[in-house]
C-alpha cells in the first residue's frame, strides 16, 4: 500500500496539495482496492493487477489535467448518500449539507411542500426527501440533461421527488403549485472572479450553475425572492 500511496503522492503533488491530496489518494486506493478507510490506514501490502495498473494511470492522467475525481469516478457523497455526477451538474459540496440540516431542523414536525429551484444533481431535494419523509418534495431545473441525472439519483436513493423543467428567471411562467419552502443553491460567482478560481472548477464544472454577470450578480436571488412573494 505504501508504494501505491507514494506513487500517487509523487504523480499528483504538482496539481493538488494538503488535505485535498490526502483525501484524493485515500479515495482512489479504497475504491480501486474495494477496501474501507480502516483497512487503508493499516497500509498492508497490495499488488495491483495489470488492469488495475492501467486504470490507475488513466485516473492519474485525468487528475493531472485538473478533472475532478468525482467526475472521473462518476459519483460523489452527500448527506450520507452517493450521487451520480457528470460535468453537466455541480459536484455536491459539504457546506450545502448545512442548508439541508437547517431546513430539517426547522421543519422536522411539519408537512411542508418544498421546491428545490435549479436542482442540479438533485442532492438537496433528495436529501430533504430522505430526512423529511412527511414532506412533499419537488425540484426543477432549466436543463433536461441535468434533470436526467437528478432523476437517476432519486431512483438510486429511493427518494420520492417530483421533477419538472423550469427556468427560475422566467417569472412569467407560473409554478405548478404554491410552496411552503423554496430552497436553492443558485449561481452567485461573478464572471470576473473566474480567473482566480482553480481549473478543477473553471475547466470542468458547468458555468451556468456557477457564474452570473458582473453587472447583475444577484439576478437569481432576486428572482427567488420574487417567487417567494408570489408563489409561496
Residue ranges and their predicted role:
Residues 188-220:
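Mobile active-site "lid"/loop adjacent to the S-adenosyl-L-methionine
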Residues 5, 25-26, 56, 69, ...:
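A general structural signal for well-ordered alpha-helical segments in protein cores
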Residues 27-105:
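Conserved AdoMet
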Residues 95-196, 223:
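Conserved SAM/SAH cofactor-binding pocket of Class I
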Residues 14-17, 133, 159, 206:
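Proline-centered flexible-loop/turn and helix-kink motifs
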Residues 214-232:
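Conserved Class I SAM-dependent methyltransferase catalytic core
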Residues 1-35, 41:
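Non-catalytic accessory regions of SAM-dependent methyltransferases
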Residues 12, 154, 228:
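Conserved hydrophobic residues forming the short capping helix/wall of the S-adenosyl-L-methionine
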